[in-house]
A protein has these predicted regions:
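Extended alpha-helical targeting/anchoring segments
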Residues: 1-529
Length: 529
């Protein structure tokens, strides 16, 4: 299809690609290309046991930014290329959604969820997910490429309240919108197994397609040149602030009171398990430098750095939120519950004998096992909601994964996605992951809001991507920091069951937060010295 024809046919995307020099250090490339640039995203994956890098996806330029708050989605065109996509929203928005033109974008308003509908009807009703779904469904690629249409970003924990009735609570310091996603215009895909780098540009059809094609092609050339001339040391630099003490929004004593209060609801039969949390905070003048330290100190299966105009989110998460692969049609949840500190000597090195004894203690702890099995059952129920009958099963049960400061009990639940659903339906049905809420999910989420008395923001939500093929890969936002106004907010929770020890649960939140706290502090100390 010629550029002239593309100008008359909205809803198409032409992919422009170039092969680049292999980038063994994607963070250095991100720092070089995007250090002070909003609407940029770095997603990195690693093998669980070896911690070897697998793939890095680096979004340099975004065409659109989509922000959801409650039942409204604001779509902002960031480039002329992005403006070409805007007519699709008015053309394809489902019934029950209104589209209003605003400065540089659109405001889409959805009807509130109807509680009288059954679970399946609610899942298929028009919702804020349709703004994302529309882009993956109604933009067709002229040439096959998995990332021709690529949406990367974050779902907040509080998106759940758009679909379930939860107590109203105010914003906390972590005021991440219900979701923020970017539609990629230019990005890098780095495969660490084959040691290849691909530069990808997406040109969307519409009246400005000729100019957009030229602009995107030129941008890829500029990126290629920038990468070829990248300094040998492009590590992010930290700020000059003096390392400060860590503050916490809830003392050990207050958190222990929350645990005891929640245990009364467990004993009353209202819930089986619940995951309260608290927030640690400290100065973070350079979140990118802190992420570099976290990646070095605590490599994890999912590592991410999201740079918005108003905030940054970074983390090294051990836990998948929801994963869906179109080619296999498999939907997957990877529940993690049950935690112990690593066995370390006084100098911080791993004592392998002590470490193995701690693992045995974890595996034989009835409280930890009961907590984990409850969450596996919850994951089984969630996956069953969206799977073909008879295809859901537990692929792995009660394995142990190790990280820098802690080890975890893990399992894996999979199923074959129903033909009438997609990855966004699956995420909606499963959010939020039970390991961050409890069971039953809505009752536990209600009690979480009662004790925490504020929205969680990004913590306990998910970061990842959806592409035009229909694939989704997301991780839970844990072992993470939300950074705003040079302050990092690091939230961590603990699973509470009927025989939980309140002090142990308080200590667990500290253990879980420690890797991120250490990374922020180390980044500051390196600058100071």
């Amino acid at each position: 299809m010629s550029l002239a024809e593309l100008g008359e046919h909205p809803g198409k995307v032409e992919t422009v690609t170039q092969q680049g020099t292999y980038l063994a250090d994607p963070l250095a490339a991100f720092t070089h290309l995007c250090q002070n640039k909003p609407n940029a995203l770095l997603l990195e994956s690693a093998e669980i046991d070896s911690k070897d890098d697998l793939q890095s996806l680096l979004m340099v330029d975004a065409a659109l930014r989509l922000e959801c708050r409650g039942n409204q989605v604001t779509v902002s065109a960031l480039t002329a290329n992005g403006r070409s996509v805007m007519p699709l929203f008015a053309e394809h928005c489902p019934a029950g959604m209104s589209v209003e033109t605003i400065t540089d974008g659109l405001r889409i308003t959805c009807q509130p969820a109807d509680p009288s509908l059954d679970e399946d009807a609610r899942l298929k009703a028009a919702s804020v997910f349709d703004a994302l779904r529309l882009l993956t469904k109604h933009i067709s690629a002229l040439r096959s490429h998995p990332h021709a249409v690529f949406l990367g970003g974050a779902f907040a924990y509080d998106l759940l309240a758009t679909f379930e009735h939860l107590p109203d609570v105010p914003e906390g310091q972590n005021d991440c919108p219900d979701y923020v996603f970017y539609l990629a215009e230019t990005m890098l895909a780095i495969d660490h197994q084959t040691q290849t780098t691909e530069l990808i540009g997406s040109v969307f059809s519409g009246p400005e397609v000729a100019n957009s094609y030229f602009a995107v092609s030129q941008r890829l050339e500029h990126l290629q040149q920038a990468l070829n001339s990248m300094p040998t040391n492009s590590a992010p630099t930290a700020g000059s602030a003096t390392p400060a003490d860590v503050s916490v929004d809830k003392s050990d004593e207050a958190f222990m009171q929350d645990v005891n209060y929640l245990k009364t609801h467990i004993l009353a039969g209202d819930i089986f398990q619940v995951v309260p949390s608290r927030t640690f905070s400290l100065p973070c003048p350079s979140p990118l430098a802190a992420y570099a330290q976290l990646k070095k100190q605590n490599p994890s299966p999912y590592m991410f750095y999201m740079q918005d105009a108003d905030f940054s989110i970074f983390g090294a998460s051990p836990e998948s939120a929801l994963k869906y692969e179109k080619h296999s049609n498999q939907v997957e949840i990877y529940p993690i519950a049950g935690t112990r500190p690593r066995g370390k000597r006084a100098d911080g090195t791993i004592d392998h004998d002590l470490d193995s004894r701690i693992e045995l203690d974890l595996r034989e702890d009835n409280k930890e096992k009961s907590e984990h099995i409850m969450l596996v059952d919850l994951a089984r129920n969630d996956v069953a909601k969206v799977s073909r009958p008879g295809t859901r099963y537990v692929k792995d049960l009660l394995k142990v994964d190790r990280y820098s400061h802690v080890m975890h009990l893990v399992s894996r639940v999979v199923g074959q996605l129903r033909d009438d659903l997609d990855a966004l339906h699956a995420y909606q049905a499963c959010m939020n992951m039970g390991t961050l809420v409890g069971a039953p999910k809505v009752s536990a989420a209600t009690l979480v809001r009662q004790v925490e008395q504020q929205r969680r923001g990004s913590y306990g939500g998910a970061v990842g991507y959806i592409n035009g093929n229909g694939d989704m890969d997301t991780c839970i936002v844990i072992r993470s920091a939300f950074v705003k106004n040079q302050t990092a907010y690091i939230q961590a929770g603990a699973g509470v069951v009927y025989d939980s020890d309140p002090l142990s649960e308080a200590n667990e939140t500290r253990s879980k937060a420690q890797a991120v706290i250490s990374a922020v502090q180390t980044a500051m100390q390196k600058e100071q010295y």
